[in-house]
Amino acid sequence: LASEDIGQADPSAISVADTAWNLVEKIGLPEAQLTLAQAAIHMAMAPKSNATATAIWSAMQEVREGRTQPVPLELISGMKKGRAPDAPAYRSPHKAEDGVGTTGYLGVDRVFYEPTDQGLEADQREPLEDLRRRRRSAGDDPETRNA
């Protein structure tokens, strides 16, 4: 329920569900009745979104249908056989000014996750669109990517 029905609209829901489960295992019933009630109310009142579920199911369908891409050369460890010595250098997103970077590793213009207008997903929509715009404008030229 917390992942499939609520998802990113209220990312705390998965923690609430996990905490409730752990408490039920630790203290048992009937003592954990209130814990379960609190978790159930949280889930019932949380905004709902299945965008995360739809995204992973779409990605899995792509894989099943053979529409996959090889691992980008810059992601293959320099210690592995088969890495070309002239492969593009890995550009760590941790070192990018925004902590995310513009490197698009998929290599194709394909989108799986589309946030809804529900809950916290509504707040994620614009930053995600901004990131996608920056990645499109950066293109595949390693010189235009964030270091």
Residue ranges with predicted function:
Residues 102-104:
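Conserved P-loop NTPase
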Residues 1-98, 107-108, 112-147:
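Terminal-proximal interaction/regulatory segments of ATP-powered molecular machines
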